[in-house]
Amino acid sequence: MHVLASIAVIAILEISRIGGAWAFDWTAEKAARVDALVSHYLRPQRLNGERPPPALSLAIGVDGNLVLAKGYGQASAGTQASEHTVYHIGSLTKQFTAAAMLRLIEEGARAPLTGAPMALETPMLAIFEGVERWNTPEEPTITVRSLLTMTSNLPNFTRRPPPNVDPWGAVPAPRLLDELKKLSPTGWPHSFEYSNTSYFLLAQVIETVRRANHASPPSYRDYIRAAVIDKAGMTRTGFVGEQPGPGYARPHYRRRPAFAQPDWLNGSGDMVSNAVDLFAWNKALMTGRIIGPESLKAMFADGGRVGPVTYYGMGWFIDRGSTWDVFSHSGSVPGYTTYNAILKRHNSASWLSVTLLTNADGVEGLDALADDLFDVARGE
């Protein structure tokens, strides 16, 4: 049996329905059910033969209340995981990049090459020089919106790396941008393709726009800190490569690390955080502290169509249900696998969140575990 680490944060909420809003109770029995589900997930012998990750940290929120946050297993040799353990969060970074881009538009920043106010429909021709290959008569114009919704049709560089750069080595962001300018859109116009290219480019858009608007410092990392991290009250969230500090989960690799060097994953997968900070992020986003109502509506709108009932919004996958909508994203970078999801009830202010962080790559089933934890929170 795995050692269960840290302290559960248990809030007892009355079951009630007031003014159409639902509140859910959280009890010691529910906390025990969570422990049982996670212990089963982390069991050493799995039917598919997959090894469990050494550590898992989670946070569960109900209507903006943190009802459970704790860690399981070993963050590193001799150190138990907790809700404060810091992990690389991989593609959960895209949620922050999307919010920062929407915030920049709200602030009235202007496009560098035209001087027009930034908008979702601003074309890349108004931001970058030398992107003529991105815009041909046969292809729709690549815009901020098409990057956010992954419908730009630009190839995903982590699937097909540019020929002149080494996926196992470092690459400066300006050089990678120059290589991406040589690409041409492919595929059915406006079709969805999961794309780290899009979110790397969004980070470059933020920097280019801020530099042209004489913002100081222009770095997209500094802007995300000021516009998102600080506003959400996140104290252990930052970027890969910075001074790590205490409490980091040691990574466990199941494959040779690629795209792990700077600046491959800028904007798409270069952030670190912990479970309680990501709950704080979910809460700040859902309560309007990061972006305004219209931007939030755009973020959670049906963007690129992924499947019959699944879309990609802006930094989140969107699944429409009969009673609840699910906004979610997974993350997978060398040494870490993560998952963050928000469950929003139709025609109600009620929402739930589940965050799961692990310190091994190639981990499967976090989405299914999150579904089980949502069922516990809803009393199902």
Regions found by a protein language model. Give the residues of each.
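N-terminal leader/targeting segments and the immediately adjacent pre-domain N-terminus
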Residues: 1-87, 103-117, 149, 207-214, ...
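Hydrophobic (often cysteine-bearing) scaffold residues that line and stabilize catalytic clefts
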Residues: 30, 34, 89, 93, ...
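Active-site-proximal loop and beta-strand segments within enzyme catalytic domains
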Residues: 50-54, 62, 76-196
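Short beta-strand scaffold segments in enzyme catalytic cores
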Residues: 57-60, 317, 340
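Short, surface-exposed loop or secondary-structure junction motifs
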Residues: 67, 135-334
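Short clusters of small/polar residues that mark proteolytic maturation junctions
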Residues: 71-73, 241, 338, 358
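A short acidic/small-residue loop/turn micro-motif
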Residues: 74-77, 262, 361-362
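Structured C-terminal helix/loop/strand segments within mature extracytoplasmic catalytic/sensor domains
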Residues: 331-380
